[in-house]
């Protein structure tokens, strides 16, 4: 077999493998997905939720960046909301995205 054919077969196999793991992850909540990376301590100090959510918000930003650094849908919320206000980690599934009308009833949509 030629190197091009082997490369194409490898790429196709890798793509199928990645899609199947993404499909599997979509059945998990955000918390279940993140706990696999090292336990509840990934998000919570000593594995316990903080009273105000500030520690958890810092943990989100340490991996995903600040709201100001994100896309246009996140920037307007910088300084006003924490990640968990929209992305309820123990309820939302991996890949689910909150919509504007979850909080806004004026017909706006994400760009």
Curated annotation (Swiss-Prot):
GO-annotated cellular components: periplasmic space
Reported phenotype of the disruption mutant: Mutant lacking this gene grows well aerobically and its growth rate under anaerobiosis with a variety of electron acceptors is indistinguishable from that of the wild-type parent strain, except that respiration with Fe(III) as sole acceptor is severely, although not completely, impaired.
Binding positions (heme c 4): 77, 100, 103-104
A Pfam family the protein falls into: Cytochrom_c3_2
Extent of the signal sequence: 1-25
Binding site for heme c 1: 40, 43-44, 90
Positions contributing to heme c 2 binding: 34, 60, 63-64
Chain residues that bind heme c 3: 74, 83, 86-87
Compartment(s): Periplasm
Top-level taxon: Bacteria
Keywords annotated in UniProt: Electron transport, Heme, Iron, Metal-binding, Periplasm, Signal, Transport
Cofactor note: Binds 4 heme c groups per subunit.
Gene3D superfamilies linked to this entry: Flavocytochrome C3, Chain A
The UniProt record lists the keyword Heme: yes
Cofactor: heme c
Recorded GO MF terms: metal ion binding
InterPro entries: Multihaem_cyt_sf, Tetrahaem_cytochrome
Tagged with keyword Iron: yes
Function: Involved in electron transfer to Fe(III). Probably involved in one or more pathways of anaerobic respiration.
Protein name per Swiss-Prot or TrEMBL: Tetraheme c-type cytochrome
The organism of origin for this protein: Shewanella frigidimarina (strain NCIMB 400)
Name of the encoding gene: cctA
């Amino acid at each position: 077999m030629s190197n091009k054919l082997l490369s194409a077969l490898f790429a196709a196999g890798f793509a199928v493998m990645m899609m199947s793991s993404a499909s599997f992850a979509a059945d998990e909540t955000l918390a279940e997905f993140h706990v696999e990376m090292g336990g509840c301590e990934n998000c919570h100090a000593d594995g316990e939720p903080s009273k105000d959510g500030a520690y958890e918000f810092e943990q989100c930003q340490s991996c995903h960046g600040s709201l100001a650094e994100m896309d246009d849908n996140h920037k307007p919320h910088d300084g006003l909301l924490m990640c968990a206000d929209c992305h309820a980690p123990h309820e939302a599934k991996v890949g689910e995205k909150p919509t504007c009308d979850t909080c806004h009833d004026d017909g706006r949509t994400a760009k």
